[in-house]
Swiss-Prot record:
It comes from the Archaea. SUPFAM superfamilies: ApbE-like. It comes from Methanocorpusculum labreanum (strain ATCC 43576 / DSM 4855 / Z). InterPro entries: ApbE-like_sf (IPR003374), MA1715-like (IPR037456), UPF0280 (IPR007183). Belongs to the UPF0280 family. This is UPF0280 protein Mlab_0453.
Length: 236
């Protein structure tokens, strides 16, 4: 298996693939998606700055329309979905090249399809459980988004307290947006109430860590003991 770091402007990723041609396809897909977003932002700067949902016209690039739709479902700004959207474009390009396996980690937002079982580590910063467990992901023919937001790890803006909130969806942009939105508001006390808002969404599972508290909702994959290497985490 090939593991290659790839950075383009502020996009910093790790690509996993079986063939170098699939890696190149992923790079091309991500560059095209990011370029589409950048060009659109020149025409609508508010799309980049808003912390609230923003619509996009039908003739906007597909990446922009995905981000806009995700912002409305999760009630966040559209840029909350940019990382997974770019990752999705790269993974989709790998599929189109004929790959049976592809994974892109864009700063903790993972998009994949796979013909094999995978382990995705759970990193939650200072939380006691951090780095000790992994999600056991069964083979996935459909693209899957596993997106994590944190108030204690990384440079992203968060208004919450969670060490990590991970959302699972076959719409990666919406997994990314929901992870951000939930991380902004989740506490151990309101978890069950907040999950009722997720029930009708595109997200089918949520795993949240706040200190020594862990919240689980939905159809989570099996969680197994693991040693998560910090060096394998994609970061700027």
């Amino acid at each position: 298996m090939i593991r290659e770091k790839f950075a383009y402007r502020e996009t910093i990723t790790t690509i996993l693939a079986d063939d170098t041609s699939h890696v190149e396809a992923a790079k091309g897909g991500m560059i095209a998606a990011r370029t589409g977003v950048e060009e659109y932002l020149l025409t609508d700067p508010f799309f980049q700055m808003s912390y609230s949902p923003v619509s996009a016209p039908a003739d906007a690039p597909e990446s922009v329309r995905c981000m806009a739709a995700a912002s409305f479902e999760a009630d966040v700004g559209p840029m909350a979905a940019v990382a997974a959207t770019i990752g999705w474009a790269g993974v989709k390009a790998m599929q189109n090249r004929g790959a049976a396996f592809g994974l892109i980690d864009n700063g903790g937002d993972i998009v994949l399809f796979s013909n094999r079982e995978l382990r995705v580590g759970i990193y939650a910063g200072p939380a006691p459980s951090s780095g000790k467990f992994a999600f056991l992901i069964t083979p996935q023919t459909e693209i899957l988004g596993i997106c994590t937001s944190s108030a204690t790890v990384g440079p992203s803006v968060s208004f919450g307290i969670a060490d990590s909130v991970t959302c699972f969806s076959h719409d990666p942009a919406k997994a990314d947006a929901w992870a951000t939105g939930l991380c902004n508001i989740l506490t151990p006390e309101n978890f069950d109430k907040v999950m009722k808002k997720v029930e009708e969404s595109s997200v089918f599972a949520v795993y949240a860590v706040i200190g020594d508290w862990i919240g689980r909702w939905g159809d989570l994959p099996e969680i197994v003991p693991a040693h998560v290497s910090y060096d394998l985490i994609t970061k700027g």
